[in-house]
């Protein structure tokens, strides 16, 4: 193993390429704001604590869902299964925004969630912290469901696995 390769790209480019080596689970963050449904594909989801149960999500400030996130607002993290690659692409494409809730597996009564996801983690926003282009969202877990079969959709080096 050697890191002796000399890179002439910017720090940002080198960092971006280094981060592409990480394998991420793929989730969709969903919420309802004044009756409007919101969903966005996220890969930056991390558990913080079991006491209290909480997680952290980073949301780009330019995302539509961003301005709906307020202290106390509710959302769901839907961990996707390997059959949900197309839905992940739809929820990450601004041009497909109106198609995000056409999948028959959405339950939109209350906080929207995907009934066929690997897991659903229901949260309330506990803290919002601005960091340059993103907001760090801390969610207090209210409930969680999971599938018995493990078949999680992952993403590495620009590809689903």
Regions found by a protein language model. Give the residues of each.
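Short, Lys/Arg-enriched N-terminal segments with co-localized hydrophobic residues
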Residues: 1-8
